[in-house]
């Protein structure tokens, strides 16, 4: 069976979902028969190419939130990630266009390293 996973590496929920999927696969008896195919997806293809603002500023502007509310939401995401063994530092995260990162992932996929590239 093939499982296609559409993911944007800029999305913190995608990485959390990847971890949860891996945990589920580890307990699934037929996991050896499953081929995971990573597909690139950009949440915001129009995002500027040069990182220029914090994730909290970006979310406040994009969603109409206050920066404090965005920070609270990112604390929730950080806690969710920690529950999956991931360490997020959302105060240091910046928003950037992920197109080139997806290109690198697809190049890595061509040499059998797509899953590893999704992690870095």
Model-inferred region functions:
Residues 1-12, 17-21, 36-39:
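Short active-site neighborhood of thiol/selenol oxidoreductases, capturing the structured segment around
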Residues 19-120:
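Structural alpha/beta surface segment adjacent to cysteine/selenocysteine redox centers
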């Amino acid at each position: 069976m093939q499982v296609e996973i559409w993911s944007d590496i800029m999305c913190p929920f995608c990485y959390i979902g990847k971890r949860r999927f891996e945990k589920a696969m580890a307990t699934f008896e037929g996991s050896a028969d499953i081929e995971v195919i990573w597909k690139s997806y950009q949440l915001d293809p129009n995002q500027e190419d040069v990182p220029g603002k914090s994730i909290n500023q970006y979310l406040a502007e994009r969603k109409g939130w206050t920066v404090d509310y965005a920070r609270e939401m990112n604390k929730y995401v950080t806690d969710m990630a920690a529950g999956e063994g991931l360490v997020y530092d959302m105060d240091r995260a910046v928003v950037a266009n992920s197109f080139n990162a997806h290109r690198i992932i697809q190049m890595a996929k061509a040499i059998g390293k797509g899953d590893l590239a999704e992690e870095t």
